[in-house]
């Protein structure tokens, strides 16, 4: 148990630690100039107890900083992190979660007894795994630097943490206002002087610990004014900050694509020490739709001897960081001794390493790596090969609440409602799902801001609980490195195979999860007990349906997954290939139009061949989604499911759109205008595909939150063919009966003829159907311009219906079926031209009641509206009976709104519209 110290005890500790304590007012607060790197420290600062930096060479800090905006990791995740860091020969963990309110927003508050016990346990676990635990605090939001009470409060807080067993600390002043309060302006000549003063004082008060980090407000090249080499702020830091204190730096930008050696030499010169890199290359807290599973890249191993350390600030989702941390470890170990490139002995460009790199990059979109010590593609394959083993290990949180990505904390008046403290893992946060991608007008201005944008990252639906089932490692005579090396060498011995193009068979999995109670929003697979395991398993008979057997995740699945969620500034090779193919198919779709003049058979064949290959690539994404959804390791699934769900949904739409392009009869020049260059907008690969669809601004249709319980169910949306007519009529009849309870047994086609027959016969170009493994279960029909469509109906469809259905006698009271028959013999009302100018397209859509996934309807509507807008439509409308509450609600959820009554509107229907 830890007790708070009294003010008297604190003052006594201060007097003991500081033989000559600095005054808290006047110029005496500004420290003397720090010696240049390599010079002796005349005051002896930093050499206390023989552990200061000046007392000898300090080890290279390499590991992880938990420094993102969003829900912090829980204690058991951090313990698992320590285990992995030790296994991969990394050595450092920096505790700096932005949304632990006692770390940043309410930094003055002391930790409670329960929180203290958890922190002590965590620090002890780090020591057990030989990981250096660095505790960071961020007082810069509201501290008054010249107030002695504020300084004492900060000391008291760090004193408490030091009593937990922590020996390494960091003061962070990132993402704060540069302006000082009036009281500080009277004492300090600049903001930098104020920060350096308190940092030096705290550093000396703590006994000049061996590891003490300082994060400046100008922590990257783009934040330095007027430049890195001429920044007065950095110059003050370099001259005044004591030499035993290390400086954190993110590189040229907040999220740096590359960190050149020259840039590090430039900043090292002005801050008079080698920096510690806070690397945001895998941080995803600035974009709710992105996940980064690509390798550590854009940092030459030549940097290692020029740095004091590298700490990666990775994805918010803990389990998604396997590749990020593993490849960082590979990068670090490739030049662990800090050997400069000019002394690395290589025989020629045909060395073994070079040959392996060339093999890995053959046929890819990436340039051949020039770093002879480290290949990102080799490192990625190493990481994925080892990660694959984790997917087959049953592992999940043992408590009821489970981490599930896909939501973010609520925001009121622009202020995030942050998760209260991370140390207490039972906090429940009110959440809403992620925002959809913005349209073309909302282009990202400037660079991603992993540290500056205080916006909640997409959060789990529920707080992860305290306990993780520990994975058991097999005790083998061989070391982990030996086993991994053998696996990778065996993989490398195989020839690089082209992408598998076999279409995946999609089957609905039998969910291993138990049914949820309605008042609980958790999603957890039940753990199998010994009693359950001992029960005799059911064995189906020869004529019974065989048991469902889930296919395991493959290395190819993980390679595809990494390519789809690669790095901030680039997509992986397969992802980039899919994007290019869709762009080409979209731009050249006119060659397969029925109305295309002067057809070129070779171009048509090329288009159809490339379209078929693109559909096969989409099928690979669906197969990957199915296998990931069925994997044994639910912990990994819960962290990544929303992202995989998102890419699966958009690829389903894109595939359907390509199929529509291949069978339509109209061409459209309008559709080919406005291509956007890749990498220009937010949202990752899914965002790129969304912006290539005609209705890219229909954010509500692309906003498809995943189900609370993960499912591997996949639906297919495809163009309608005449052979589908009976199935569409059946759905139309069953859903109409369900809505009003009026069977049409004597005239089974009547309701279909009335609602959808004309569209199916005269507007094939704009008709889609929904399929699952049992067949067609939905339809989405439309016509781009209702005026000529009505004329065609009067010429061909209506006469056919009049012949098929005899006009009933109007003298008697008519049944519902007879009223429909009579409508074929009556003159149809024509909608006003003023209305049709804005809503020229007619749509009809419905889905069978057995389909419970709400995202399916959005995808179907997106496909239908894309086809209409691609051919010039400005808006669409539908006609609904006023008493059909189900279908009214159905269309309303799809973004349709009721059009105000105007002269010429039919009296017995409600007209809903949607602008395009």
Curated annotation (Swiss-Prot):
Reaction(s) catalysed by this chain's protein: 3-O-(N-acetyl-beta-D-glucosaminyl)-L-seryl-[protein] + H2O = N-acetyl-D-glucosamine + L-seryl-[protein]; 3-O-(N-acetyl-beta-D-glucosaminyl)-L-threonyl-[protein] + H2O = L-threonyl-[protein] + N-acetyl-D-glucosamine
Biased composition (Basic and acidic residues): 452-461, 468-480
InterPro entries: Acyl_CoA_acyltransferase, Glycoside_hydrolase_SF, Glycosyl_Hydrolase_84, O-GlcNAcase_cat
Active-site residues, Swiss-Prot/TrEMBL: 175 (proton donor)
Sequence positions bearing Phosphoserine: 364
GO molecular function: [protein]-3-O-(N-acetyl-D-glucosaminyl)-L-serine/L-threonine O-N-acetyl-alpha-D-glucosaminase activity; beta-N-acetylglucosaminidase activity; histone acetyltransferase activity; identical protein binding
One Pfam family recorded for the sequence: NAGidase
Biological processes per GO annotation: dATP metabolic process; glycoprotein metabolic process; N-acetylglucosamine metabolic process; negative regulation of cardiac muscle adaptation; negative regulation of protein glycosylation; positive regulation of apoptotic process; positive regulation of calcium ion transport; positive regulation of calcium ion transport into cytosol
Temperature-dependence annotation: Optimum temperature is 37 degrees Celsius. Less active at room temperature and shows very little activity at 4 degrees Celsius. Loses activity at 57 degrees Celsius within 5 minutes.
Enzyme Commission code: 3.2.1.169
Amino-acid positions noted as binding a protein in the UniProt annotation, renumbered to this chain: 67, 98, 174, 219, 278-280, 285, 313
Subcellular location: Nucleus; Cytoplasm
Known tissue expression: Detected in spleen (at protein level). Ubiquitous. Expressed at highest levels in the brain and spleen.
A cellular component term, taken from the record's GO annotations: cytosol
PROSITE patterns: GH84
Protein keywords: Cytoplasm, Glycosidase, Hydrolase, Nucleus, Phosphoprotein
Top-level class of the enzyme under EC nomenclature: hydrolase
pH dependence (UniProt free text): Optimum pH is 6.4. Activity decreases sharply at pH below 5.0.
Similarity annotation: Belongs to the glycosyl hydrolase 84 family.
PANTHER family registered for this protein in UniProt: O-GLCNACASE (PTHR13170), PROTEIN O-GLCNACASE (PTHR13170:SF16)
Assembly description: Monomer. Interacts with CLOCK.
Name by which UniProt lists this protein: Protein O-GlcNAcase
Species in which this protein is naturally found: Rattus norvegicus (Rat)
Lineage: Eukaryota, Metazoa, Chordata, Craniata, Vertebrata
